[in-house]
Structure formats: C-alpha cells, structure tokens
C-alpha cells in the first residue's frame, strides 16, 4: 500500500494517527500501521499521545505505538506519567499551542525539569558556616538494622547538611565508627525504640532544624507508640519514612493535626498499607491517589516508584523522570530520606525540598549507571549527590 514504503525507509516517523479520545481497541488498517511503526528502525515522535494508548489510564487499547518521543500539547495527560503508559511515550516533551488555561490543563501535574531544580536549590553564601546549613536529626535503626541509619546519615551529609546527628538504640550505635562526620548517640537500653524514650529524644531534638524518622526502626508495638509521640509533639519539619509510615497506619495518627510540617516518603507497598488499598490500585491511580492523600492530610507526599510522584497539599503534583532500574536495591529509600532532610535544613520548604531531593537522588543513580548499569549501591548514590547538584546548578 501507499504508506508502507515511507514507514520502512524513513528516518523519523511523526505519529498523529489517533488522538486522545480513543475508547475502543485499535483494529483494521490503523492496527497495521501501528505494527509497522513499531517494527520500523526510524525514530517515532508521537503528537500528544502515542496512537492506541488510552490518555486516561495509560493502558494500550489492544496495541499502541512505542514512541521515542511524545510531545504533550498544552498539558500532561495521565498516560504520560502512569504505568505502563510512560513506557510507550518515551521521553515526554511539553509544547504550548495557545489554548486557554481552562481548556489546556486536564491534569494538575508537571514533569520536573533540570532547570527548575537548579533554580530551586539554594546557593552557598561565601561567608556561610555549618550552623547556617542545617542541623539534621535522624531517628533510625534498631538491632540488626543499623545500616538504615548509616545510609540516611550518608544521604544528608552528601546533600550538604551542616551537621547530622543520628539518634539510635545501643546495638545500632556501632555506626559511630563508620562515618566520623556523623554525630551518633544512643538512647535507652532496648534493641528498639520504645515510648519511654520519646522524652529524651525530643529533648535532644530541640537543637535540630529538621527530623527524619523511620529507616530501620522496626515494627514493634512499643516503637509504634514512640513514633506517635514524636509526630504528635514535634513542631518543626519532619520526614516520615519506612517503619514510621507503618506506625502512622497502625496507631491511627491524624496527620493533619500533627504540629510539624510533614513529608511522607512511601513506596507503593507502604502507601497501599497506609491507605488500605491494593498495590495494583495505587499504581493505577498513582497521581490522583497521591494528590488526594496530600490534600486530605495536609502533607507533602513522595510516592516512590517509576515514576516517583511528589504531591503537594495544594493539589498539584510533580513527576520525576530521573532514576533507573539499577536503583532497585536495598537502602535507596533511606538515602533519599537523608537527602530531603538535608535540603529542608538548608531553608527549603518541604515541597521544593522533596522535588529537588527526588531529582538529585535519581540523577545520582543515572550518573552511576553510565559506568555500571547494575551493581552500584545506596552508598554510591549518596556519594554521587554532590556531582549531581553541581550539574544542575551550573550556569
């Protein structure tokens, strides 16, 4: 037929075969064209949405174009950021085409751009000192889980924190000799945190600008009560991760009534537990679910995964495209917690700190993946953060 030869011989294919209103499976000649585009060696650029992809769900309607690039017209659609849609879209580029704002914006979401991160990150003043770069407190670790406290501390240090204190239990305090820059102290005599330790920890925390709580804490009932004491009494910013998220659900903590500014960093499984939903439901409604949760609880939510979604309490969300499969290893989330805490300590508000922290964390992994796609560790990612930060702030 007339269209076969160009598809087989062209260098670039512009896909504008089907628009955003697709409601049934693709068939007939259109299906044949999509199959030929996917079999072609040419670069494929889809206009607004890859043909055959549902713009609302991100699911292929029978079959869909596997684009190298997708140009989102006037607004991002759910398929650009939801799985599996984003895999069909390739790299998503944004283009305004002059539509009124009310018509153009169908989804309150934006992709995080390197330029935006560079503009958000604070520049160091020539005369600054460690006291101006944030005193970070990390409540983490339990017997056998000291590595989580270590990694969160590493993340904070390499993200530029002025001082980092790790508060843990005695058996996890062995990290004190691993990183001399960490100020490690222990409380109590138990293998895990208990509610009886809350008062001492809060007294220590009076000196801190921001807290991070959760990595490696464990899920003992006493630890859950300890977490509730901290969250309901701490009045400064706090990053809530890992086992502390489990306590939020089990102790029925009303996040909207907590006095501090909260940043929650669950992965899909943790968010499913937190909301009483299945992991499949969370993935299917990754953006809308994150936005609803952040607005209802008045928190900043970092829903980790591919892609990571940062939802603000004003109802807007940001989608991160940095990061790669090599980062699917233990401890990556602990490192991210430390990075975000460090940025909050550098006088960033929770929302931009989460945006920048997630982007830098993923970019650090991407830089490592250029040399070693698989096999690098969370510690390696932490050590790469200064280079990633330098890259995004270069003129």
Predicted regions and their residues:
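Small-residue (G/A/S/T)-rich helix-start motifs and N-terminal tracts that mark the onset
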Residues: 7-10, 80-238, 242, 246-263, ...
């Amino acid at each position: 037929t007339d269209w076969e030869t160009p598809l087989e011989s062209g260098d670039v294919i512009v896909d504008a075969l089907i628009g955003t209103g697709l409601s049934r499976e693709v068939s007939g000649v259109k299906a044949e064209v999509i199959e030929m585009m996917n079999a072609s060696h040419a670069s494929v650029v889809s206009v607004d949405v890859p043909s055959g992809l549902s713009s609302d769900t991100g699911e292929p309607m029978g079959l869909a174009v596997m684009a190298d690039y997708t140009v989102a017209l006037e607004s991002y659609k759910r398929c650009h950021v939801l799985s599996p849609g984003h895999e069909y879209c390739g790299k998503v580029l944004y283009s305004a085409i002059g539509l009124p704002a009310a018509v153009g914006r169908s989804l309150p979401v934006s992709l995080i751009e390197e330029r935006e991160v560079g503009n958000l990150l604070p520049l160091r003043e020539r005369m600054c000192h460690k006291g101006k770069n944030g005193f970070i407190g990390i409540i983490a670790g339990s017997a056998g889980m000291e590595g989580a406290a270590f990694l969160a501390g590493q993340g904070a240090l390499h993200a530029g924190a002025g001082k980092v204190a790790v508060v843990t239990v005695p058996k996890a305090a062995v990290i004190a000799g691993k990183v001399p820059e960490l100020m490690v102290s222990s409380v109590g005599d138990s293998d895990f945190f208990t509610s009886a330790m809350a008062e001492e920890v809060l007294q220590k925390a009076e000196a801190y600008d921001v807290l991070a709580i959760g990595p490696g804490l464990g899920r003992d009932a006493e630890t859950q009560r300890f977490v509730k004491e901290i969250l309901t009494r701490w009045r400064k910013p706090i990053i809530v991760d890992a086992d502390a998220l489990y306590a939020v659900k089990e102790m029925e903590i009303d996040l909207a009534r907590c006095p501090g500014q909260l940043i929650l960093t669950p992965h899909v499984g943790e968010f499913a537990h937190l909301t009483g939903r299945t992991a499949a439901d969370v993935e299917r409604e990754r953006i809308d679910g994150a936005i609803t949760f952040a607005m209802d609880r008045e928190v900043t939510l970092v829903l980790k995964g591919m892609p990571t979604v940062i939802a603000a309490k004003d109802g807007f969300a940001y989608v991160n495209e940095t990061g790669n499969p090599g980062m699917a290893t233990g401890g990556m989330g602990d490192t991210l917690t430390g990075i975000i805490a460090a940025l909050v300590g550098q006088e960033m508000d929770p929302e931009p700190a989460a945006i920048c922290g997630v982007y830098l964390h993923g970019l650090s992994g991407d830089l490592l993946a250029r040399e070693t796609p698989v096999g690098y560790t969370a510690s390696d990612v932490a050590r790469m953060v200064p280079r990633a930060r330098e890259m995004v702030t270069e003129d």
